[in-house]
Amino acid sequence: RKERHRYQQGDLELKEAITNISHDLRTPLTAINGYLDLLEREEKSETVHCYLSQIQNRTDVLKNLTEELFRYSVVTSFQELKPERMDVVRALEESLLSFYAVMQEKGIQPEIELPEEPVFRELDAGAVNRIFSNIISNALKYSDGDLSVVMDKNGCVTFSNTAHNLNYVTVGRLFDRFYTVEASRNSTGLGLSIAKLLIERMGGSIGAIYNNDKLQIKIIFAK
């Protein structure tokens, strides 16, 4: 019992630390971006322009990491979700549309199969959008050039893509907090763990299957 209490206390302290760190980083990052915008308007040599471009890129990465940490701290704070009757088909369509530019840039032509009729569920709209966005973002990040999204009439959604850089071990850890497939500092490894936490809080489930270099992530929303 003491061990459990110690674990819960440690987990609470970790969440508080993440919240504080992400919050403290947001203000200086906003200031840095402001100064970079001002410098972009000044005349400068090609070398200085190159340096500024690198600084901007790394600042954007840090900003994205900070925002992801902040979102994670919000999700794990167990703020009350607000279920409402919503069309899951439309929510998925909107999420896919928001990634259209990224897909174009990567040369990915997604194969999409959605029900013609709406699929209504009592869900938190913001949480559903976050779930879809995190899964699509992850799929595009590690895809070898393809993406398939299929939803059946019961609202079960399957995201599939070829991913030669994965294996059964990495797939088994995809939903772990802070786990990243690559030893990269460009990701916190929280995207899929946030998706899992949110969907389970709404009574649904999520899982991953890896077979013949194909990754499938399937989510089922509670009826």
Which functions belong to the PLM regions below?
Residues 84-97:
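A conserved beta-strand-to-alpha-helix junction within the catalytic ATP-binding
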Residues 166-178:
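Short conserved segment of the HATPase_c
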